[in-house]
Amino acid sequence: MARIAYSTKIEGDNLARGKANELSISPKHSIEIADFIRHQRVNDALAYLADVVALKKAIPFRHFNRNVAHKRGLPGNWDAGRYPVKASKAYIRILESIKKNAEYTGLDTENLEIIHASANRGRAQKAYFPRAMGRASPKVRETVNIEIVVREVA
């Protein structure tokens, strides 16, 4: 696999980064989660995503909200929301890795703020479903590239 650079050029001594490439999760769900956790503290984002996995709190869907039901108790002034469990588990894994990276570099893991979170569509994996009468139908498995940068705040 090719080495993929970060899309942002943020430099500094008080940063920690983490990324995951070609995850088999929904691109729309991962984009909504990235928009939601941006500018939050890492521990707050981890707690909220754990509640999403437990189906206690929903992620507000701001972009991909056509035919999405209203959910009660969404933060901000949003109505539509869902519980993207699989994508939330992937984000939890990346945020835990970032906390360990920050601890290794000597940052305080209690005061980390997410300053950059992005999710982009990755490479599409193409395959075929065998069908009746010797036919085949194409299927495309979408992948996602996620990158998160955190900064230690005072």
UniProtKB/Swiss-Prot annotation:
One of its GO terms (cellular component) is cytosolic large ribosomal subunit. The gene is rpl22. The keyword rRNA processing does not apply. Part of the 50S ribosomal subunit. Belongs to the universal ribosomal protein uL22 family. One of its GO terms (molecular function) is rRNA binding. Gene3D superfamilies: Ribosomal protein L22/L17. This is Large ribosomal subunit protein uL22. One of its GO terms (biological process) is cytoplasmic translation. This protein binds specifically to 23S rRNA. It makes multiple contacts with different domains of the 23S rRNA in the assembled 50S subunit and ribosome. The globular domain of the protein is located near the polypeptide exit tunnel on the outside of the subunit, while an extended beta-hairpin is found that lines the wall of the exit tunnel in the center of the 70S ribosome. The keyword Ribosomal protein applies. Keywords: Ribonucleoprotein, Ribosomal protein, RNA-binding, rRNA-binding. HAMAP family: Ribosomal_uL22_A (MF_01331_A). Pfam families: Ribosomal_L22.
